[in-house]
């Protein structure tokens, strides 16, 4: 019975939804792809890892959980989906499918000095793949390992439209206090207007 349910979920996930296609891509971030500035977090920080210094907070090895908030295509698929995110890019919610971000609780931010917009890294412990991200959403106390769809994709973690991961992937999330002002090093990825 479980196999049938999984096959049905996979079949539904692969269906083409032309009505919602405009919500599923088209550029970095949840906002107008022509209004992006370096530093929005679409790539790594200028100066790379060395610019960030030592991590102020680490999740330790934890099970990856996918946050679909900010991605309009997640509505009705993820039971915990929310249209808005705590952080914003160009005045709009941060789209989980297009922007690598991590989720931290207010308590985790308070004890570590990390703020919205600070840089983070996500590492897939099985493969060693690491991606840069920003802290862009607030979650419940005690939560760890919650990452955006884009961050999961960046480290090779597969997931279903309802936010369930394929398998039981583990990640380490590190966040770096006081790094929000470090611009992204991504001018080649920006769209000129």
Feature names for model-found ranges:
Residues 2-7:
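Sec-dependent signal peptide recognition
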Residues 12-14:
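C-terminal motif of bacterial Sec signal peptides marking the signal peptidase cleavage site
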Residues 16-18:
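Bacterial signal peptide processing site
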Residues 24-116, 126, 138-146, 156-193:
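Secreted/periplasmic proteins
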Residues 123, 128-132:
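Short, mixed charged/polar active-site loops
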